[in-house]
Design a protein with these regions (language model features):
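A short Gly-Trp-Pro
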Residues: 1-177
Length: 177
């Protein structure tokens, strides 16, 4: 639900590089090169099948772990390197829905980050500094509540010992500029 979701668009060069590596630029990036991600409570995500096809890459030494289906190179989600903080960012392009259903399920995009947005477009694209603070005000209480309840240990991409269920591959590359 929109109350438990944080919907953002990231325009960083690493998200763009990831789309290129998966050969999914057309489906992963919007017209400005942004990747839409919705951040959710890790324990609310369940992988029903295909765990044996999961692959993981990371583009920087301490950066996000980027999970995808190795069989079709479909992006699934981003996590931190280790479980603990309750963070999973699901890539919106991996879900089959209509725009109406997406808006109902996730609410509006709360903020667009890591891009250069012309001042005239910042309000429309939700790329103002106040949008960042608003997003943090919405998400931070949930994040810390989930953390206090230990929900960061229930991330489906890690086993009970906290090890990734697929060995992360370090891809040495540069961000898209």
């Amino acid at each position: 639900t929109p109350e438990n979701t944080n919907r953002v668009v990231c325009e960083c060069g690493w998200c763009q590089r990831y789309a290129h590596l998966l050969e999914r630029v057309d489906t992963m990036l919007d017209e400005r090169g942004g990747t839409e991600v919705f951040q959710i409570r890790p324990s609310s995500l369940e992988l029903l099948a295909g765990q044996d096809r999961l692959e993981c890459m990371h583009l920087t030494s301490g950066g996000a772990r980027r999970w995808y289906a190795g069989c079709c190179r479909s992006p699934i989600a981003n996590t931190l390197a280790k479980p603990g903080p309750p963070f999973v960012g699901v890539l919106a392009c991996c879900v089959d829905w209509t725009q109406v259903a997406k808006e109902e399920a996730l609410g509006p995009v709360r903020v667009r980050v890591n891009g250069v947005v012309p001042p005239a477009d910042r309000t429309r694209l939700r790329a103002r500094r106040r949008d960042q603070f608003s997003m943090l005000g919405h998400y931070a209480p949930k994040f810390f509540g989930w953390w206090l309840r230990g929900e960061g240990k229930q991330i489906p991409f890690f086993d009970a010992a906290g090890q990734p269920i697929a060995e992360p591959e370090r891809i040495r590359t540069e961000p898209v500029r």
